[in-house]
Curated annotation (Swiss-Prot):
This is UDP-N-acetylglucosamine--N-acetylmuramyl-(pentapeptide) pyrophosphoryl-undecaprenol N-acetylglucosamine transferase. The lineage of its organism: Bacteria, Bacillati, Bacillota, Clostridia, Peptostreptococcales. Its EC number is 2.4.1.227. Coiled coil: none annotated. One of its GO terms (molecular function) is UDP-N-acetyl-D-glucosamine:N-acetylmuramoyl-L-alanyl-D-glutamyl-meso-2,6-diaminopimelyl-D-alanyl-D-alanine-diphosphoundecaprenol 4-beta-N-acetylglucosaminlytransferase activity. CDD domains: GT28_MurG. NCBIfam families: murG. Pfam families: Glyco_tran_28_C, Glyco_transf_28. Belongs to the glycosyltransferase 28 family. MurG subfamily. It comes from Clostridioides difficile (strain 630) (Peptoclostridium difficile). PANTHER family: GLYCOSYLTRANSFERASE, UDP-N-ACETYLGLUCOSAMINE--N-ACETYLMURAMYL-(PENTAPEPTIDE) PYROPHOSPHORYL-UNDECAPRENOL N-ACETYLGLUCOSAMINE TRANSFERASE 1.
Length: 409
């Protein structure tokens, strides 16, 4: 039976790739034993159990970029997380460990590497994080989502890098527009816009969306807008004077991404790598608003890549206003031919086969490990049998004494 340990957390961008990988393994190996390692406060504590997987939690937090007392406390949490991860790995005895990013995956991958357990990193972004760069030297394999990210890894990891793309959840890949619209009670004739600012929401996008929502209500356009849980009450208070119709929904968090994405004609969102993988897998035109504070400014790079290929429009946060977003939305909705061209461009970027490529690489590592283990076990068995034969054919010291002590007659 295959035993797999996955770790990734903090944001949906790290959790959902792990879910996609776990689902693929479970589909191919129904008897596989799969567990996740995350934190109690991370979004993984809500998402992982919903997909029917066991979640073990550890205490760990990411570091702030400035040096302060809070960072000192986080150092102690890191050591605690390392010890907790070590115990989980030791007890579960996984055949393979897979990390999909977020601060929680670091201690897990580190302990796997130190324990000589095959370990794989999946890097979603074009600019790998510091932890993944360091661990890439010790893990078995590094799966990447952007080919140009390879130049940003250490030279010691060069032979371990494999370009696979970002995995998209099966329910999204299998979703269809007509069925999704029926599920959401949205007629085929209506134009429909989906907007979300990542798993935690975006205040910048929320501020700009108030005007857009007002005008979409006036134009009788269907929409689903996810504000982020922490912003929901505030946002709903700010649009209390607007009467929404049943097919015009504002929600704190998007539980059913598959139907919402499939039903849409236009998507507005941030430039997280997984969000873009999902958008392009279904061939959706988009308005991409990269978050400005991301590491290495990788979201801006992602957004400009989408725009350069004609699949979307990028609006930087510093240029985002209610008016600029409203203009972009209604220009696109008013030009069906342009939307179709953008949709086709988006579809060519999408990599729906990524999950199969990732699974193949995982199985290569797993199978090679099993062969090595089998050879080792066979060798140990042979050595044991040789020792037994030698023991049976070699007289003991006591036996030798008795033989020497026999007197000749």
């Amino acid at each position: 039976m295959m035993k797999v340990l996955l770790s990734g957390g903090g944001t949906g961008g790290h959790v959902y790739p792990a879910i996609a990988i776990a689902n693929k393994i479970r589909d191919e190996h129904p008897d596989a034993e799969i567990i996740f390692v995350g934190t109690e406060k991370g979004i993984e504590s809500e998402i992982v159990p919903k997909y029917g997987f066991e979640l073990k939690t550890v205490t760990v937090q990411g570091f702030k970029r400035k040096i302060d007392f809070d960072n000192v406390k986080r150092v102690f949490k890191l050591f605690k997380g390392l010890e907790q991860s070590r115990k989980i790995v030791k007890k579960f005895k996984p055949d393979i460990v897979i990390g999909t990013g977020g601060y929680v995956s670091g201690p897990v991958l580190f302990n796997a590497s130190m324990g000589k357990i095959p370990a794989i990193i999946h890097e979603q972004n074009s600019f790998p994080g510091v932890t993944n760069k360091i661990l890439s030297k010790t893990v078995t394999k590094v799966l990447t989502s952007f080919e140009d990210s390879h130049k940003r890894f250490p030279e010691a990891a060069e032979d371990k890098l494999v370009f696979t793309g970002n995995p998209v959840r099966k329910e999204i890949l299998l979703s269809r527009k007509n069925i999704a619209r029926k599920n959401l009670s949205i007629s085929d004739e209506k134009r429909m816009v989906l907007c979300y600012g990542g798993s935690g929401g975006s205040r910048k996008i929320n501020d700009a969306m108030r005007l857009v929502i007002k005008n979409m209500v006036n134009e009788d356009i269907a929409f689903i807008f996810a504000t982020g849980k922490s912003y929901y009450d505030e946002f709903m208070g700010s649009i209390s004077d607007i009467n929404l119709k049943p097919y015009q929904k504002v929600v704190p968090y998007l539980e059913d991404m598959a139907n919402a994405l499939a039903a849409s004609d236009l998507v507005i969102g941030s430039a997280g790598a997984i969000s873009l993988a999902e958008i392009t897998a279904l061939g959706k035109p988009s308005i991409i608003i990269p978050k400005a504070y991301t590491a290495e400014n990788h979201q801006e790079y992602n957004a400009k890549s989408i725009e350069k290929q004609g699949a979307g429009i990028a609006i930087l946060e510093k240029n985002l206003t209610p008016e600029s977003l409203n203009t972009a939305v209604f220009k696109l909705l008013g030009d069906r031919e342009l939307l179709v061209d953008m949709a086709n461009a988006s579809k060519t970027i999408g990599k729906p086969e990524a999950i199969d490529l990732i699974y193949d690489e995982i199985m290569k590592v797993y199978n090679s490990t099993q062969k090595s283990t089998s050879k080792k076990t066979k060798k140990e068995k042979v050595i044991k049998e040789v020792k037994e034969i030698k023991k049976e054919t070699t007289p003991s010291i006591e036996g030798q004494a008795k033989v020497i002590g026999i007197k000749k007659r």
